Amino acid sequence: HEPEVDRPMLAYVKGDKFSLAVDAGYSKKHVQDFYRALRSCDLKEPDFTVITHWHYDHTFGLHDISGVSIAHQKTNLFLREQQDRANDKKYIDILKKDDTHFAKEYAGENELNIVIADIEYVEKMTLNLGNITAHIFHTVSPHSEDTTCIYIPEEKVLFLGDSTSEDFFNGGYMDKRKLQHLIERIYSIDCDYCVLSHCEPLKKNE
């Protein structure tokens, strides 16, 4: 996580056969910085990239990723809406005006390249990465209705994206019923660590 531009954390899961990234980043620059960090650790670019939700800081780098992208069907629906809005060349300026972090990330840029994910799922799907399993599932969340989480049972790690946060695209509204449903879902999963996109990893009981 990079607070000066509010870049979300991009995670990497390595199996014996395949690798997986969590989220596609804020921009082409974000993706390139992530891949540069992977190369410095002698890690290859990911075979799969799973999107946690449609918000632009998690998806506007999707056009520059390697491998195959995966998202919930609602995520692609929202991204298609963003594509339509981006047909208006002024849309990037509107986003810059509305979000100072976006303005910093896209300083000097005057166009957007918004794409949808290659693979859509509805309820859940599983990837065998080679002695590492990624359980990908949709869940109720107060943050966004297309929320995807990724559970790695061998590591007892649960990637939550921004799922516990309020809905910033709805006036910062926090639906407590949805939050309670999400908390119950988290507690039902055998994980030791929960990884959110904009803060340090937490132990489950935190």
Language model: regions and residue ranges:
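Conserved beta-strand hairpin/beta-sheet module of binuclear metal-dependent hydrolase folds
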Residues: 1-36, 148-162
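Active-site environment of divalent metal-dependent phosphoester hydrolases
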Residues: 7, 28-29, 54-60, 76-79, ...
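Divalent metal-coordination and catalytic microenvironments
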Residues: 13, 23, 38, 53, ...
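Active-site neighborhood of phospho(di)ester-bond hydrolases with catalytic His/Asp-centered motifs
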Residues: 21-24, 46-55, 70-73, 138-140, ...
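Active-site metal-binding motif and surrounding structural segment of the metallo-beta-lactamase
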Residues: 29-75, 187-193
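Divalent-metal (often Zn2+) His-rich catalytic cores of metallo-beta-lactamase-fold enzymes
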Residues: 72, 151, 178-206
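Metallo-beta-lactamase
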Residues: 80-138
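Active-site-proximal loop/helix segments of hydrolase catalytic cores
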Residues: 133-186
